[in-house]
Amino acid sequence: MALLKIIKAGDPVLKATAKPVAKVNKHIKKILDDMAETMYAADGVGLAAPQVNESLQLIVLDDGNGLIELINPEILEMSEETNIDTEGCLSVPGYYGKVQRASKIKVRSLTRHGKTVIYEPEGFLARIFQHEMDHLYG
């Protein structure tokens, strides 16, 4: 595995829509592995591929309960209930802001084995999912 360079706000790749992953192969799995290593080394809770200069729909995240990898994630449902909390971002070091997010979401994604999985995160984990998915859409 390798540490990747986290690009900073203002880079054009962060403003572009990331491409869906056509096929989960060794290259995609290596990117996921490297992203996880990079996220943990930076003491982050989430990292999207555009943040490491890969315009692909890949996310790694960990709220303290284990690594979750998302490939081509799609939000299927969002609760009407929302909450406002402070968020930071590895691409904008040292900056924190209040953001309103859905309290609960339902997300469909692929695993590194190409299987479809449904997640229904709530609270802090739902916030991480939404923050990282924002990176996929510029």
Residues of each region from the PLM?
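Positively charged
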Residues: 1-138
